[in-house]
Structure formats: C-alpha cells, structure tokens
Curated annotation (Swiss-Prot):
This is Phosphatidylglycerol--prolipoprotein diacylglyceryl transferase. It is a multi-pass membrane protein. GO terms for molecular function: phosphatidylglycerol-prolipoprotein diacylglyceryl transferase activity. It is an enzyme of class 2 (transferase). Catalyzes the transfer of the diacylglyceryl group from phosphatidylglycerol to the sulfhydryl group of the N-terminal cysteine of a prolipoprotein, the first step in the formation of mature lipoproteins. Its EC number is 2.5.1.145. The chain crosses the membrane at residues 17-37, 55-75, 90-110, 125-145, 174-194, 202-222, 230-250. Belongs to the Lgt family. InterPro entries: Lgt. Keywords: Cell inner membrane, Cell membrane, Membrane, Transferase, Transmembrane, Transmembrane helix.
Length: 272
C-alpha cells in the first residue's frame, strides 16, 4: 500500500492571499496548452502567435465557465439552489469535464468568427494540446484528495492508499493518477503523433472524442461514484460514463465521415 502525500491544499501564502494547488494546476494547464499550440503554429502556415494567445484565452474562459456551470447542473444543482454564491467559489473544487468541453466548443465559435477559421480546422489544431490540461487537472484533484477511487478488493494491491478526506478510511485506488496518465499523458502522446501528419478535416477532433471517451469510460470503473449520484443505469453505469457515451459515438461517426470526405484544409508545414 502507498502512503498518500498529505499536501497542504494551499500552495502559496502571500499575506491574506492564498493560491490553492487546484487553481495552480489550471494555470499550468493553460500555460502548457499555450506552449504546445505555439509550437504547432510555427509548423504550419496561417497561424500566428497572437491567434494562439487569443485561442488559449477563449478556451480558458470556456473551460472555467463551462466546467463550473456544468458541474453545478450535472452533479450539484441542489447545492447551488441552497447557496447560489457557491457557484463562484471555484477554488473549492468542483469542475465538470463535460461542461468544460461544451464551454470550449461555444468559445471556439466566437474565436473562429473573429479569425475566419473553420470550426473543425480550429478544433483539429487545438485538440492535441488539451490532454495535458486534463492531466494537470487530475493532479489537482489528487492533491485536494477529491474524486478518489473505489475501495481496493485485493489486499495485496500495491498502489492502494487511504485518503484523509475519505470518511470511511478505506484503502482505495488513486484513480486521479490513473486518469492523469490515461486521459492525460497517454491520450496526448497518441494525438500528438496522429496530428503530426496531414489528416482529413475532423479526424484529429474525432480521435480526441474517441480516445477520451474510451479512457474515461474505463477509468470510471476505478473511480468512486459521487455519493449523491451512485450508479444510475443498469446498476453499474455512472453519470460520467453516461455523459461520455455520446462523445464516443459522435467521435466514431466523425472519423468515418472524415475519411469518407477526405477534405484536407491544413496548410503545408513551413519547414517541409
């Protein structure tokens, strides 16, 4: 069994100002996305550093607003009704990937209108940069001791740990780390490799939806369902799995459509 590194959720104390690890992870996520997108822009025609900076800014707004609103609507609407101010207390945790995803989709529409880019051209460009942000987000969940995994059934399982935030003090899967590795690092490697060569329009976005859909669906089997949600469908499907199934199906259709149409709207690489 591993020992949980009980880290102070406040990373930096600056007098009355407290910088939480959760917020710091979001900052690192956006900086990493900006760096990766800037690198991709240098490899392709039609993209500038100003466009990338604006793209990340729009995306950050979509993630924060959509993620928080989505979490409230999908998971904690009753809590919001009791205390509407809680919606704005982002530093306490509570963000939904699916809400953040929808928020980014909407934000990209405004960015595309400003820069006269097609929606899928933009999504294909930024999709490989997203998984690193997911990775940092899950690390933030781990440090905060939230969204931990289900209880370990094998007493000899070497990676189980007891989270101090768990009222039952059971040995559990560190599912946040599993998700950081699968939905984050592994998906990033796959998407970065796939997008390094010319692909049909929508193909990279489709692979993101498929890859995240599969990874999230599998990881939910290790993650403890929210106490007020439990298993919603068939006695074993969680809210996260239900919300992920449409992403997977849409991704499959998009990949099929992309290779049926074979429209290549990416500019040639500058260094080729």
């Amino acid at each position: 069994m591993l020992t949980y590194p009980n880290i102070d959720p406040v990373a930096i104390h600056l007098g009355p100002l407290q910088v939480h690890w959760y917020g710091l992870m979001y900052l690192l996520a956006f900086l990493c996305a900006w760096g990766l997108a800037s690198y991709r822009a240098k490899q392709r025609d039609g993209w500038t550093s100003d466009m990338v900076s604006d793209l990340v800014f729009y995306g950050a707004l979509g993630v924060v607003l959509g993620g928080r609103i989505g979490y409230v609507l999908f998971y904690e609407f009753d809590k919001f009704l009791e205390n509407p101010i809680w919606l704005f207390q982002v530093w306490t945790g509570g963000m939904s990937f699916h809400g953040g995803f929808l928020g980014v989709m909407i934000a990209m529409l405004f960015w595309c209108k400003k820069y006269q880019k097609t929606w899928f051209q933009t999504l294909d460009f930024i999709a490989p940069c997203v998984p690193t942000g997911l990775m940092f987000g899950r690390i933030g969940n781990f440090i905060g001791g939230e969204l931990y995994g289900r209880a370990v059934t094998d007493p000899n399982y070497p990676f189980g740990m007891i989270f101090p935030t768990d009222p039952l003090h059971l040995v559990r899967h560190p599912s946040q780390i599993y998700q950081a590795l699968c939905e984050g690092l592994l998906l990033f490697i796959i998407l970065w490799w796939f997008s390094s060569k010319p692909r049909p329009r929508m193909a990279v976005s489709a692979l993101f939806l498929m890859g995240y859909g599969v990874a999230r669906f599998v990881m939910e089997f290790f993650r403890q369902p929210d106490a007020d949600q439990g298993f919603i469908l068939f006695g074993w499907m969680t809210k996260g799995q239900i919300l992920t199934v449409p992403m997977l199906l849409i991704g499959l259709w998009m990949m099929w459509y992309a290779y049926q149409k074979k429209i290549y709207d990416w500019g040639p690489q500058k260094n080729s």
